[in-house]
UniProtKB/Swiss-Prot annotation:
Its main location: cytoplasm. This is Phosphoserine aminotransferase. The gene is serC. It catalyses: O-phospho-L-serine + 2-oxoglutarate = 3-phosphooxypyruvate + L-glutamate; 4-(phosphooxy)-L-threonine + 2-oxoglutarate = (R)-3-hydroxy-2-oxo-4-phosphooxybutanoate + L-glutamate. Catalyzes the reversible conversion of 3-phosphohydroxypyruvate to phosphoserine and of 3-hydroxy-2-oxo-4-phosphonooxybutanoate to phosphohydroxythreonine.
């Protein structure tokens, strides 16, 4: 029996994608091979690779000025790879810290340069806001400005992206990429691990403006130097072939759903239903400012936290899994990525109401 999976990542995948992957497991398109067995330079895998790149470019409307790269190491590795590729002759990069992940990025950058905290969204209740551009205190000549536009742990999503002129804007989009249209031209670099909205764990997507490919530090490993990866069409080393294949199936699924405009409408509906339920109750609490509440990751707390384990056990009994909040913040978290259907959110909301009534 399939359950409703609210995991923050690895996360739910579309059932259509899983079934197609199962059907093609032993024999991909009459090749007699599984994708897992293919040479990454053979014509069979190259067709998968090129289709995935083309479909992602179409979905996000990536301009010709930007290259799409498939790497490894996830978003955490990019916290090191970004400064190694962008600091160049500069020492300083600016960070707007809105949650746990941008804080990790800031801390990692200290190994390669001098990160500057331009703004923070931390309050007495934790990370609950996204500082407006007027609050940012940028340094004189930063190599780039870093944002995490959706904080998976804290549930803060930044929707308003300012124009920084000549300063490259770098965004960790791991947990909201492909959930809504984006103006990719505003960014110097976008990066995201796949295991939330792109596909399965193993591949990392980096979208980088071509004029930024010549800034790498000499210490940057060749396999992580964007210029080298781009020159080799993401095949400098053996890529995570099966993860790219799954990502390609997800891209095709998204196109069949009507693209990102249609997906965004669904995601707004799902998030509104869940937040409305939280706000209308006297039992559940979300502390994030409404204007920057994440559509993908919804943290909430029970008024009586001694009942947390009862809540999770009851949810599991109804087939509602992976609702425990991150250990750093506690409480609950429902990650409602693209592949989580509206029916799953409705089932969660029904359970939340029942649980609240039983405890009243």
């Amino acid at each position: 029996m399939r359950v409703f999976n609210f995991s923050a990542g690895p996360a739910a995948l579309p059932e259509e994608v899983l079934r197609q992957a199962a059907d093609e497991m032993l024999d991909w398109h009459g090749s007699g091979m599984s994708v897992m067995e293919m040479s990454h330079r053979g014509k069979e895998f190259m067709s998968i690779h090129e289709a995935a790149l083309a479909d992602l470019r179409e979905l996000l409307d990536v301009p010709a000025s930007h290259r799409i790269l498939f790497l490894q190491g996830g978003g955490i590795a990019e916290n090191a790879i970004v400064p190694m590729n962008l600091l160049g002759s500069r020492q300083t990069a600016d960070f707007v810290v809105t949650g746990s992940w941008s804080q990790k990025s800031f801390n990692e950058a200290k190994k390669y340069g001098t990160p500057h905290l331009a703004a923070s969204g931390k309050t007495a209740d934790g990370f609950t806001r996204a500082p407006a551009r007027a609050e940012w205190q940028l340094s004189d000549d930063p190599a780039y400005v870093h944002l995490c536009t959706n904080e998976t742990i804290d549930g803060v999503e930044t929707f308003e992206i300012p124009d920084l002129g000549d300063i490259p804007l770098v965004a960790d989009v791991s947990s909201h990429i492909l959930s809504r249209p984006m103006d990719v031209a505003k960014y110097g670099v976008l990066f995201g691990g796949a295991q939330k909205n792109i596909g399965m764990a193993g591949v990392t997507v980096v979208i980088v403006r071509e004029d930024l490919l010549d800034r790498a530090l000499s210490i940057c490993p060749s396999a992580f130097e964007w210029k080298t990866v781009a020159a080799n069409n993401s095949l400098y080393n053996t890529p995570p072939t099966y993860a790219i294949y799954i990502a390609g199936l997800v891209f095709q699924w998204l196109k069949r759903q009507g693209g990102l405009e249609a997906i965004e409408a669904r995601n707004i509906e799902k998030a509104k239903l869940l937040y409305d339920t939280i706000d209308a109750s006297g039992f559940y609490l979300n502390k994030v400012e409404p204007a920057v509440r994440s559509r993908m990751n919804v943290p909430f707390f029970l008024a009586d936290e001694t009942r947390n384990e009862d809540f999770l056990a009851g949810a599991k009994a109804r087939g509602l899994l992976q609702l425990k909040g991150h250990k750093s913040v506690g409480g609950m978290r429902a990650s409602i990525y693209n592949a989580v259907p509206l029916e799953g959110v409705k089932a969660l909301v029904e359970y939340m109401k029942d649980f609240e009534q039983r405890g009243a």
